[in-house]
């Protein structure tokens, strides 16, 4: 069975995908924290879908 190798989302270094890889998909704690900081600073976000069906259900129901 061959090893699965992924790229670190922060620095693109190869990371072996296995339970022992403590920071997977990141190569290190440093890269993991950089990514977390980008989310916290709202530099990254999940794109919203315009005219989402659920959005109209939530409007005016606070």
Swiss-Prot record:
Residue sites binding Zn(2+) per the record: 8, 11, 27, 31
GO biological process entries: regulation of DNA-templated transcription
Cofactor notes: Binds 1 zinc ion.
Keyword Transferase assigned: no
GO molecular function: DNA topoisomerase type II (double strand cut, ATP-hydrolyzing) inhibitor activity; zinc ion binding
Protein family (similarity comment): Belongs to the DNA gyrase inhibitor YacG family.
Quaternary structure (record): Interacts with GyrB.
Function as written in the Swiss-Prot or TrEMBL entry: Inhibits all the catalytic activities of DNA gyrase by preventing its interaction with DNA. Acts by binding directly to the C-terminal domain of GyrB, which probably disrupts DNA binding by the gyrase.
NCBIfam families in UniProt: PRK00418.1
Entry protein name: DNA gyrase inhibitor YacG
Species of provenance: Actinobacillus pleuropneumoniae serotype 5b (strain L20)
Taxonomic path: Bacteria, Pseudomonadati, Pseudomonadota, Gammaproteobacteria, Pasteurellales
Gene giving rise to this polypeptide: yacG
